[in-house]
A protein has these predicted regions:
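Conserved beta-strand-loop-alpha-helix junction that forms the acyl-donor binding cleft
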Residues: 125-135, 156
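Conserved GNAT acetyl-CoA-binding A-motif
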Residues: 115-128
Length: 160
């Protein structure tokens, strides 16, 4: 489990409070909260966005289904998929009130660690090309080794 450093308590300055955010594998009882997070984060629903499918994911590949928890509330999530050949990042989402705190970047880094531990040498992120804020986020991760693959509109990096 990774904890963020304290965020500061200067509310008049616009800074967040001192609550820490923990990143860890999702628990079965948190799947409904993840679905709600995806909805409030503006994710486009897919056929697998059901409580049953997420609970199955927790059961079968739970170490790659990560959540960010603040004050017992799911404020972020990411799915790190491993197919035995390449690691893939899906469904990166952060609650609007938890944005601009590098939480999405922390979730991506933790997902990369999970996949590296499984043997992944290359990572890929599926990004919806019409989501300008998402594309901007991944472009910003060039400092972490991510680069855009123009042929497929995906981002890849070595999992070193």
């Amino acid at each position: 489990m990774i904890r963020a450093p304290p965020m500061g308590r200067k509310s008049r300055m616009g800074l967040r409070d001192d609550a820490t955010i923990a990143i860890r594998p999702c628990r079965r009882e948190e799947c409904a909260a993840v679905l709600a997070l995806w909805e409030c984060a503006g994710a486009i629903p897919s056929a697998t966005d059901t409580l049953e499918e997420l609970q199955r994911l927790v059961r079968t590949h739970g170490d790659g289904f990560l959540v960010a928890i603040q004050r017992n509330t799911v404020v972020g999530s990411v799915i790190a998929g491993w197919d035995g050949w390449r690691g893939n990042i899906y469904r990166l989402a952060v609650a609007p009130e938890a944005r601009r705190r590098r939480l999405a970047q922390r979730l991506v880094r933790e997902a990369a660690l999970v996949m590296r531990a499984k043997g992944s040498r290359r990572l890929s992120a599926l990004v919806e090309s019409h989501e300008a804020h998402a594309v901007g986020f991944w472009d910003h991760l060039a400092a972490d080794g991510w680069r855009r693959d123009e042929r497929m509109m995906r981002y890849i990096r070595a999992s070193d």
